[in-house]
């Protein structure tokens, strides 16, 4: 029996109707577009379509082995019924290829899905640190729900990182794609709640981390913090059961490290955490790590001490509550005991850290040097605050200007050491700082970001963290949209690529504290300047938003003190009755309600949008 295509061709010839001519999408396009059978824009010497998708344009040299010239329709009609035409469809991807970058993924992916997962690997995993990022990528390759969440985060991160270089219609399409993947991940994640094994719990915890990052990138900070609370409550239940997790997607110490960073976000912003018991004291972890052998261990150990410090600040607020004398004595004893414990832990860590820097650490990698500067910055900050008297008073900051300048010097070094963010053009800040000196600060408002991931990672990280220098051929289900364009993805350099988003210990909380607590104009405005120039988002800490808030607070205090704009002043020029405290809360969406309080009286209120 003749093939169906043969019957159609023969029937056409018998009736005298000319057969339809099979043509490619591009006759005069470049070789690459002709092979892919997509429309070429015929830009020379290299077409923009190939460049926008990260492909190499092979130029316009004719393909070898030209197809025979087709007969005119009149000659084809006279050819007779004995002529047989075989019409064969050639798919865009001739043969599915194995995903070299993601060998654990055994399902077919669309181009959008592959590009999202590729971007997650090349750019996004560095935001979690080398070890945690590797384990999250490994979990995404093994679990479909986590993989879908990783795709959504990769797509959203790509939209944010390339925002200024992407046309508006492509940005809208990227946002829509990220939200579609986000909703799909939520639907798949709901199925994990039905499971009772440790793998299901790990999947939920991993998705809480990824969803937090995705909502933070969108600017939905209240929703992001809710994901943190959900994950911390799951961890608290695990701790109460006292069961050791087995067959997990992520090692327990990796989960602990990730949620220590997320808990710090809740404590810094809201002063609350689900891991606080009824007395407001922390539910302590399983113990401190061993003596420091890697920079990442130093970061994890310090993070534990830093979170205890934040819990201490939160609980110390009870000292201002009206209670009877006996209860107040008990609260004071608890606070001072907790403060002494934090001080002891910090002193012990400092000795270990100094020994690590002197005898183990090698100063070779710029990203590692940034991480060391970050730890030195926060050690100085915590040591200074713990020696102010407890709880710290507004008047105490004026006597620690030397330590504050050391902290600002370290923050400046971190920003200057960061590679320039070439992926995005510099954008000026919303407000200007005219009239205020920026002692020790480089001029201009360079847009920079920083990466604090350690170069020294443990050997038990999953092998999927290794990045090849070339992009593997994706195993595609179909090409979703011939008109869609993709910004080229470059191989990750030896140290992590600059990223506008990170979960690592950052500079913004320290700079914000100095900008709002210190009333020396040179120190205050240098801190505000560094916030604006950092161009960075550390979880829910957004440099642009907090730059606006810090500048607004400073101007409120200066106006109340009768100071002209741009005037230099010391602590004494801002009396207590002119000082302002911010009481803010993130609302749903991209806004926050900010109240300005002076001497326990609300003097103003404002809604901030971003």
Curated annotation (Swiss-Prot):
It comes from the Eukaryota. It comes from Emericella nidulans (strain FGSC A4 / ATCC 38163 / CBS 112.46 / NRRL 194 / M139). This is Aspercryptin biosynthesis cluster-specific transcription regulator atnN. Disulfide bonds: none annotated. Keywords: DNA-binding, Metal-binding, Nucleus, Transcription, Transcription regulation, Zinc. Transcription factor that positively regulates the cluster that mediate the production of aspercryptins, linear lipopeptides built from six amino acids including 2 highly unusual and nonproteogenic amino acids, 2-amino-octanoic acid (2aoa) and 2-amino-dodecanol (2adol). Residues 1-27, 61-81, 427-493 are annotated as: Disordered. Residues 66-79, 437-474 have a biased composition (Low complexity). Residues 30-57 bind DNA. The keyword Transcription applies. Residues 1-26 have a biased composition (Polar residues). One of its GO terms (molecular function) is DNA-binding transcription factor activity, RNA polymerase II-specific.
């Amino acid at each position: 029996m003749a093939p169906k295509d043969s019957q159609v061709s023969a029937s056409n010839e018998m009736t005298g109707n000319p057969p339809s001519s099979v043509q490619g999408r591009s006759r005069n396009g470049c070789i690459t577009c002709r092979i892919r059978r997509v429309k070429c824009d015929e830009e020379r010497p290299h077409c923009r379509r190939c460049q926008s998708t990260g492909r190499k344009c092979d130029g316009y040299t004719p393909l070898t082995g030209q197809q025979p010239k087709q007969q005119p329709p009149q000659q084809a009609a006279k050819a007779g019924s004995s002529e047989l035409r075989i019409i064969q469809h050639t798919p865009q991807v001739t043969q599915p290829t194995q995903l070299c970058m993601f060998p654990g993924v055994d399902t077919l992916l669309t181009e959008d899905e592959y590009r999202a997962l590729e971007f997650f690997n090349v750019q996004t995993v560095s935001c979690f640190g080398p070890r945690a990022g590797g384990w999250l990528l490994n979990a995404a390759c093994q679990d479909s729900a986590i993989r879908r969440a990783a795709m959504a985060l990769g797509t959203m991160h790509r939209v944010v990182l390339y925002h200024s270089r992407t046309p508006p219609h492509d940005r809208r399409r990227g946002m829509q794609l990220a939200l579609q993947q986000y909703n799909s991940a939520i639907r798949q994640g709901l199925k994990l709640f039905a499971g009772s094994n440790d793998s299901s719990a790990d999947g939920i915890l991993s998705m809480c981390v990824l969803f937090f990052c995705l909502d933070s990138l969108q600017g939905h900070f209240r929703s992001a913090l809710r994901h943190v609370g959900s994950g911390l409550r799951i961890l608290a239940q695990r701790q109460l059961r006292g069961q050791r997790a087995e067959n997990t997607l992520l090692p327990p110490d990796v989960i602990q490290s990730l949620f220590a960073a997320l808990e710090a976000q809740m404590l810094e912003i809201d002063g609350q955490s689900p891991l606080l018991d009824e007395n407001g004291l922390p539910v302590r972890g399983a113990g401190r790590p061993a003596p420091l052998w890697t920079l990442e261990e130093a970061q994890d150990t310090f993070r534990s001490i830093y979170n205890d410090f934040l819990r201490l600040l939160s609980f110390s607020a009870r000292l201002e509550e009206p209670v009877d004398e006996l209860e107040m004595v008990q609260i004071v004893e608890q606070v001072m005991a907790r403060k002494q414990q934090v001080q002891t832990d910090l002193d012990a860590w400092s000795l270990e850290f100094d020994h690590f820097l002197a005898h183990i650490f090698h100063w070779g990698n710029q990203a590692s040097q940034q991480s060391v500067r970050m730890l030195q910055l926060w050690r100085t900050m915590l040591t200074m605050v713990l020696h102010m008297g407890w709880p710290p008073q507004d008047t105490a900051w004026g006597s620690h200007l030397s330590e504050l300048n050391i902290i600002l010097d370290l923050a400046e070094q971190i920003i200057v050491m960061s590679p320039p963010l070439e992926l995005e053009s510099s954008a000026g800040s919303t407000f200007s700082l005219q009239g205020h000196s920026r002692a020790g600060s480089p001029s201009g408002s360079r847009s920079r970001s920083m990466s604090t991931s350690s170069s020294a990672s443990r050997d038990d990280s999953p092998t999927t963290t290794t990045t090849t220098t070339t992009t593997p051929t994706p195993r595609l289900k179909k090409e979703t949209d011939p008109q869609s364009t993709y910004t080229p993805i470059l191989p990750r350099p030896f140290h992590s690529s600059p990223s506008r988003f990170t979960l690592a210990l950052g500079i913004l909380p320290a700079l914000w504290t100095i900008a709002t607590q210190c009333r020396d104009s040179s120190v205050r405005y240098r801190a505000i300047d560094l916030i604006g120039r950092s161009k960075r988002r550390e979880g829910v800490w957004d440099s642009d938003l907090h730059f606006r808030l810090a500048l607004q607070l400073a101007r409120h205090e200066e106006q109340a003190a009768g100071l002209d704009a741009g005037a230099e002043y010391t602590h004494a020029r801002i009396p207590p009755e002119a000082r302002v405290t911010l009481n803010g809360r993130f609302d749903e969406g991209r806004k926050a309600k900010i109240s300005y309080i002076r001497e326990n009286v609300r003097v103003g209120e404002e809604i901030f949008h971003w």
